[in-house]
Amino acid sequence: MSGWFFYALWYNEASTVAERISILSYKFLLFDLDHTLLDFDTAEDIALTHFLEEQGVTEIQTYKDYYIPMNKGLWRDLEQGKITKSELVNTRFSRLFSHFDIGKDGAELALLYQQHIAQQGQTYAGASELLDSLTEADYEIYGATNGITAIQTGRMANSDISPYFNHIFISEKMGTQKPEALFYEKIAEQIADFDLSQALMIGDSLTADIAGANNAGLDSIWYNPKKLMNNSSV
């Protein structure tokens, strides 16, 4: 399915969307979190500001301009199996400061940053209304996220959407990640009476959410609010 279907969610058309999902006979809705329901860009910006201020950085925007694309690249490498989660977490901040000729302990910085980002639970406008509508329609709602357990758990606890979820499946805790089929297989093992034909994956990432759903044999909806062209093989 194309992005227009889920794009309507952020225009207070949750009831219409719920009706469409009902027609398609889904029961289990698997939502990606970051960039789908949780506003990661805002969360990251606030957390980085506090973190960099603590480190005595004065040129905060300059550091952000380097870190943000570098971090995205590391997450892409993780999705493709080029690096491990430990490498990503424990080296991204040492790489950041090394770029500015400053030596820092990456693992120590990771823990400090984690304290800031875990407090950020910002969601997109309309997210709670959508989930409320789907909950009233008796869907089982689950989170399916690639991320760090302490961070994602903290952010959800600080959000207004946590009560709508039956469970949050986090890649670090599961020992596997999207787009691996094993990620979805482990989800299926933990949900009572789970049926692939009644499950729908909803997310913003073609390479993680949609490709992962394809690998596992699930239907999916690509959340594409920026109306990006799909130039991938997915």
Task: Give the positions of each predicted feature.
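N-terminal helical cap/lid subdomain that shapes the substrate entry/recognition surface
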Residues: 23-125
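Asp-based, Mg2+/Mn2+-dependent phosphohydrolase catalytic module
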Residues: 7-12, 17-29, 132-135, 142, ...
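A generic structural signal for short
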Residues: 81, 118-119, 140-141, 197-198
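A short, Lys/Arg-enriched amphipathic alpha-helix followed by its capping loop at the start of a domain
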Residues: 51, 130-137
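Hydrophobic, well-structured mid-protein blocks that either form specific transmembrane helices
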Residues: 119-131, 141-144
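Generic recognition of short, well-ordered alpha-helical segments
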Residues: 42-46, 125-129, 154, 181-182
